[in-house]
């Protein structure tokens, strides 16, 4: 059994990955950790999330002594922490020889010049960054298996890239237009006015400036127009994407492109039938649906995932299973 420490376990994503690892007979939880200043330190996870009443582990403060114990006892560490926190923790644990599964954006760009603009910090660990691989599980399995620094993709990029990567060679240079809606858990657990029950409403945000736009573009190899929206539901993402395909592309070409997922059990592709968020909520699945207009060459593809599962925790769990080869 492999031992995994989970840092940032009090948040939505941290609690979700805790539940997945707890249920995995090939893994054991070394410990659950929060920052030393957290109001949740010392509490059992089940006090914060009664859904996980079967998990009695406490949320321990991440002291220097705790970090040393993790380095001694664990095989891997999951970071469900803020980008600026993960930046330093990931480098430290990587240098101790642990495999790092980072759910933040601190290691998703290989080009360190991207970080000041999109994350507000200079990247201090170019050597560690050079080892980082992008953990899009269905596409980068070999790299995930070989590397000890796995940057788990963002939720919107996971939904968008799963839809677009199979058809990239069929697309023109016209920018794909991605309109995506996420449930409010994507904004995190901290209280905010715009995500409170009485205030939340369907609205776009981060227009022409969301940090997931360059993440999608980098991994796709093509610029995109990406507009995220906040929806008045708890969890899930629906991305509806319009792309122009090259002249002469046929419906059969599209079918063949998406056949790459025939052996991917977590990805379902349907033609002329579009996914619903409710069908993927609380699952590790991605549902794709597409329709093609041969007269105009436009393809519309919709992608539905659970933002806390396939968009975060269950994809991290996939990466753990791929890396430790079970």
Swiss-Prot record:
InterPro entries registered for this protein in UniProt: AGPR_AS (IPR023013), AGPR_type-1 (IPR000706), NAD(P)-bd_dom_sf (IPR036291), NAGSA_dehydrogenase (IPR050085), Semialdehyde_DH_NAD-bd (IPR000534)
E.C. number(s) listed in UniProt: 1.2.1.38
Organism listed in the record: Shewanella woodyi (strain ATCC 51908 / MS32)
Pfam families assigned to the protein according to its UniProt record, in alphabetical order: Semialdhyde_dh (PF01118), Semialdhyde_dhC_1 (PF22698)
GO MF: N-acetyl-gamma-glutamyl-phosphate reductase activity; NAD binding; NADP+ binding
Classification via PROSITE patterns: ARGC (PS01224)
Catalytic activity: N-acetyl-L-glutamate 5-semialdehyde + phosphate + NADP(+) = N-acetyl-L-glutamyl 5-phosphate + NADPH + H(+)
Cell compartments where the protein resides: Cytoplasm
Active site per the UniProt annotation: 155
Name of the protein in question: N-acetyl-gamma-glutamyl-phosphate reductase
Keyword NADP: yes
Enzyme class: oxidoreductase
Pathway listed: Amino-acid biosynthesis; L-arginine biosynthesis; N(2)-acetyl-L-ornithine from L-glutamate: step 3/4
GO cellular component terms listed in the entry, alphabetical order: cytoplasm
Main location (coarse class): cytoplasm
GO-annotated biological processes: L-arginine biosynthetic process
UniProtKB keywords: Amino-acid biosynthesis, Arginine biosynthesis, Cytoplasm, NADP, Oxidoreductase
PANTHER family per the UniProt record, alphabetical: N-ACETYL-GAMMA-GLUTAMYL-PHOSPHATE REDUCTASE, CHLOROPLASTIC-RELATED (PTHR32338:SF10), N-ACETYL-GAMMA-GLUTAMYL-PHOSPHATE REDUCTASE, CHLOROPLASTIC-RELATED-RELATED (PTHR32338)
Record carries keyword Cytoplasm: yes
Function: Catalyzes the NADPH-dependent reduction of N-acetyl-5-glutamyl phosphate to yield N-acetyl-L-glutamate 5-semialdehyde.
Family per similarity comment: Belongs to the NAGSA dehydrogenase family. Type 1 subfamily.
């Amino acid at each position: 059994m492999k031992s995994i420490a989970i840092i940032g376990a009090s948040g939505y994503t941290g609690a979700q990955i805790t539940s997945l690892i707890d249920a995995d007979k090939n893994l054991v939880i070394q410990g659950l950790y929060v920052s030393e200043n957290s109001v949740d330190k010392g509490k059992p996870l089940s006090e914060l999330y009664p859904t996980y009443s079967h998990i009695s582990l406490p949320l321990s403060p991440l002291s220097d002594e705790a970090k040393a114990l993790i380095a001694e006892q664990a095989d891997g560490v999951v970071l469900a922490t803020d980008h600026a926190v993960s930046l330093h923790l990931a480098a430290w644990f990587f240098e101790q020889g642990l495999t790092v599964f980072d759910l933040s954006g601190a290691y998703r760009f290989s080009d360190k010049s991207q970080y000041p603009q999109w994350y507000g910090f200079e990247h201090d660990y170019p050597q560690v960054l050079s080892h980082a691989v992008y953990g899009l599980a269905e596409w980068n399995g070999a790299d995930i298996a070989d590397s000890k620094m796995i940057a788990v993709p963002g939720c919107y990029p996971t939904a968008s890239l799963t839809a677009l990567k199979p058809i990239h060679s069929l697309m023109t240079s016209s920018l794909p237009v991605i309109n995506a809606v996420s449930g409010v858990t994507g904004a995190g657990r901290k209280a905010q006015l715009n995500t409170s029950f009485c205030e939340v409403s369907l609205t776009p945000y981060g227009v022409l400036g969301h940090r997931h736009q360059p993440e999608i573009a980098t991994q796709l190899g093509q610029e995109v127009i990406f507009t995220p929206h906040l929806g008045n539901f708890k969890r899930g993402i629906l991305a509806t994407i319009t792309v122009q395909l090259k002249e002469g592309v046929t419906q059969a070409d599209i079918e063949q492109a998406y056949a790459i997922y025939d052996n991917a059990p977590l990805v379902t592709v349907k033609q002329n039938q579009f996914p619903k968020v409710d069908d993927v909520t609380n699952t590790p699945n991605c549902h794709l649906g597409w329709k093609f207009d041969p007269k105009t060459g436009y393809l519309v593809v919709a992608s539905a995932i659970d933002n806390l599962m396939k968009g975060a925790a269950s994809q991290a769990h996939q990466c753990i299973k791929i890396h430790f080869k079970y």
